[in-house]
Amino acid sequence: MIKFLILIFLIFSCQPLPKDVPLEKYRNQFIEGQVLFDDSLKGKVPKGDYFLIISVRDLENPMPIAVLRVKKPKFPYHFKITGRRKLNHDRIMEGQVLLTARISVSDKAEIQKGDLMGSTNALVGTRGVKIIINTEVK
């Protein structure tokens, strides 16, 4: 009887996805690249513990779609942000987005005086994106 129930379960659970499910939209939810330093800021990396915080947001909404936090990374830092890093799984990483990289002694979301930042626009699904940290928050 158990074998029969397992067989019935497998038959009904292995149905094809509906044709209107946009698999490519979900498959391409990534951005891959490097975070680099402008030469003028290389000496300003904090001593001791610090965090690299990379955020992805669309061009209309200030709330990030995805965030990656890394403690004391080596530079140039190679990153890949995928849909697994999304803050809200109802939002989709797609189209043109703004990537921001920030070096901070705090792992918090708020920008603080002394943080080092850089940003660039990128297309979701792109590899080879470069974010250059070139600004100090005053």
Predicted ranges, named:
Residues Q15-P18:
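Bacterial signal peptide processing site
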Residues I31-D39:
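A short, amphipathic beta-strand motif
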Residues D20-V21, L36, P76-K80, T120-K138:
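Extracellular beta-sheet/turn segments enriched in Thr/Pro/Gly and aliphatic residues
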Residues L10-S13:
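C-terminal motif of bacterial Sec signal peptides marking the signal peptidase cleavage site
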Residues F51-R57, L98-R102:
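Beta-strand signatures of extracellular beta-sandwich domains
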Residues T100-G114:
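Short acidic/polar inter-strand loop motif in beta-rich domains
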Residues L68-H89:
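A beta-strand/beta-hairpin structural motif
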Residues M1-L7:
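Sec-dependent signal peptide recognition
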